[in-house]
Curated annotation (Swiss-Prot):
Gene expressing this chain: DNJ1
Induction of synthesis: Expression is induced by the unfolded protein response (UPR) and controlled by the UPR-specific transcription factor CIP1.
Protein name per the record: Tetratricopeptide repeat and J domain-containing co-chaperone DNJ1
Disruption phenotype: Leads to hypersensitivity to endoplasmic reticulum (ER) stress caused by the N-glycosylation inhibitor tunicamycin, but only to slight reduction of virulence. Severely affects growth and displays an altered morphology, when the calnexin CNE1 is also deleted.
Role: Endoplasmic reticulum (ER) protein that functions as a co-chaperone for BIP1 during ER stress. Might be specifically involved in the refolding of N-glycosylated proteins.
Entry domain remark: The TPR repeats mediate interaction with unfolded polypeptides and the J-domain is essential to stimulate the ATPase activity of the chaperone and to increase its substrate affinity during the folding cycle.
Keyword Endoplasmic reticulum: yes
Amino acid sequence: MKATLLPSLLALSLTLCLALGLSSSGVLVRADAFASSQPPVVSDPVLASQHLTQANVALQSGRYQDALSAFDLALQADPSSWLTYYRRATAQLSLGRTSAALQDFQSLLKLNPKFDKAYLQQAKVYLKEGDCDKAKQALKTYDSIRAEKGAANSSPAEANSVRSKLTLVETSIKSLGQLVKELDKAQKADKKGKAKELDSTKVDHCIHLAGEVLKISPSHLETRLVRARCQTMKGRIEDAMADWTRAVHLTPSPFLLRRLSVLSYFVVSEPGSQSRDAGLQHLKACLHSDPDNKSCAKMHRKIKALEKSLKKARNFYNSQSYRAVLSALKGGKVGRATVVDDIKEAIRSATEVQSGDEEPLIPSTYKGDPVQESGLLLELHTMYCKAYTELNDMDKAMPYCELVLAKDPDNVEATLARAELALQREDYDQAVRDLTKAFDASGRTDRAIHQKLQTAQKRLKLSQSKDYYKVLGVKRTDSLATIKKAYRKMARENHPDKGGSQEKMAQINEAWGVLGDEELRKKYDQGDDPNDPMGGQQGGYGNPFAQGGHPFDMFFQQQAGFGGFPGGGFPGGQQFHFKMG
């Protein structure tokens, strides 16, 4: 009898469990789970409560990631808790994860369609993303639920704020659209030669209106692109690049990534800046999102090849191997384009519309000449300037140095090169000006520049009194043999026995006494006159180290000054007697 009743009792027990929605462990089970092929969804409110407590503690201490993990566990323990979805959504928003937050709001509203706060939060997220239509619809549903609850006339301040912001965004976008049409019309007319320069006030208004929209809706892609365009019209290319960078984060664009790469690498970058690295990173991002993109792959190969040559040149430059620098910059093959030529061609190509594109990579609204403004070319021109100067080939150095100074008037290397040329031309005023400028730019701490400045100052002083080279009619760069030949000729012509004056002969002998001695000539070329008893004693003239800074420098300068030169010198000016024959 008992054995017969047992199966019936088990069947009855199972029926009751199904009816009550209980599992064998006493945990609530959704009854409809048994009606489907899916495994039953078990709910454990006690465990869920524990995870919620952990999540709330994490939220209060700003540990949003820990809070999210706890919310995930809470929802696993109790998937029917719509309030937990709401809390997790707010944590997602704190981390900027708007898409995940919107999904949580959707899950919440399936469980509790009348939870008005979820619609308000949805409206805020949609507005931030610039989706005005969805924001408006969410607000409409929010107002409808509030009306059902009898609270239509007591709208919270938060809801009113969303409404006013939505109105401002819609109005600004409409005005911006009209303004863009006017700018388009003016630009097209300008290309045909029928209009003057674009109205600057309208361009400013474009930037202002777009800025107002983006304060509220930073993810509004179209407005960000419009502002970037107006920034280029204003000549603010780096501000435009910031907007394009944000745009490719919102929606990957191979074209914009190539544009950013060209501008970052070739135009706005400076030596050692992050822009150079960004130039390659933009192309890597393009190939990551679109591995088969031929345009990005081609540009990536080109820049990698350039970087290989540039790395060589930079290494030689830093090790002061200047002939090797020039060799590295000649390019990979003899007779082919140089590295500078390759860079100029890359920039020029970027100003033209390429196959498959609708506009050039460097916008037609770009103000100025991107070749002249290229930061990469500035670096290479500086290398050429320095290398040729160090190799004492000023004729080749100066064209590059002038290009550097045109873009960067305070460039130390180019200023030093110009000073060196001035010294060679015996234009000591210019040399002193340039060396003073370079010394100031170095923070007045570069001893090599300071030494050159002192030499130029001494030469300037000597040129205003005695110029032995001029006396003999020779150049500072002439050889000893040439100087000796000139001396003999002048001595014959000006000897008192031949009708010359004693004074003129004394000047010739004095000049030869210095220039005919290699050691004395070197001293004179450094700005010290061996025949001047006070030679070298310039006190603090142009010397920041003369007082207080480096006392030993002053001591050595004084030692060099007394006596004029080793061995006592010729304090009164030595008289040489020339014998004919």
